[in-house]
Amino acid sequence: AVQGNHPSKLNPLTDTSVFLANEIQNKQYKIFYYDPKDLSVVNSKVVAEGFFIKFSYSNKKFYKIIKKQNLDLSKCKFILIRQDPPFNLEYISTTYILDTIKTKVKIINNPTSVRNISEKLYSSKYQKYMPATIFSQNMDEIKKFFKKNKKVILKPIHSFSGNDIHLLTKFNPKLVNKFIKKHDHIMCQKFLPKISNGDKRVFIINGKVCGAISRVPKKGSILSNMSKGAKPTNIKLTSKEIKISKIIAKDLKKENIFFAGIDFIDQKLNGDINVTSPTGLKTLYDLSGINLAKTFWKELKA
């Protein structure tokens, strides 16, 4: 089963959920798809109202709903948690619900681990590999940090896809205050001008570093997210990036995280450890012919 945003909201040309589902469908598995809002606990059973679906890259419409159904999810072999953040209370509630069946069904990523690993805050243990970074909502701390670093990126801790990211080149208490009011604790990071050359997204599957792509921001932008117009390219990782990636991959495996994406800018970890719904596998396949969806399911012994 796939727990995710409705297929009509997905772009099959880049979407990793579709890519993973299509691959397992080729192995004769049936795909059941549901929205997190349709997840319930009824008579002590975890059920979802959703539909069986078929994906096809060759058809004009890339999916076909076969049959709507209310399904007992404990009968599934695998469940992929694939809805986009924000990581809010609704997201957290779905992890608690799925926790109750995780001994019966293989859930990727493990719902307890998804809940425990804050995608930004988890990186605080890797700060020696990162540009100068603080997590705070204290105005004095943020001001001090800005004075020291001159150009600072402000990021919400629980958002995604480059949403609400600000580059601060002049300290603006009004703007910072507004940002804190909206997001509570925020991530402040020394700006790395080499972002204009692109970042690197590294894919980790079952504790192994499996591949990477680069994403180059469009002219005049600092955002390397493809959803914000960044252009993906093929890339090789440096030995330094591989070393850091392996350390994180080993830690994530211990934390029961099967699939993750981590990002580098200028050989520095940018602090996003993506464990909710990492993306980029379809793009890697289109650029290089490397099919990590095959690796993903092979590692799960599907």
Which sequence ranges carry the predicted segments?
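Phosphate-binding site of ATP-dependent enzymes
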Residues: M139-D140, K147-K151, H158-I248, L252
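ATP-dependent carboxylate activation and anion-phosphoryl transfer catalytic cores
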Residues: K9-L13, K236-A302
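Nucleotide-activated donor-dependent transferases that construct or modify glycoconjugates
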Residues: A1-K9
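Short acidic-glycine loop/turn motifs at beta-strand connectors
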Residues: Q28, S40-V42, I204-V209, Q267-K268
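Conserved N-proximal alpha/beta basic substrate-recognition cap immediately N-terminal to
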Residues: S8-F135, E141
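Short glycine-enriched loops at secondary-structure junctions
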Residues: P111-R115, R215-K218, I265-L269
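Short glycine-rich anion-binding loops that position phosphate/pyrophosphate groups of nucleotides
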Residues: N5-H6, Q83-P86, I157-S159, P278
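Redox-cofactor binding/interface segments in oxidoreductases and associated redox assembly factors
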Residues: V2, L80-I81, Q189
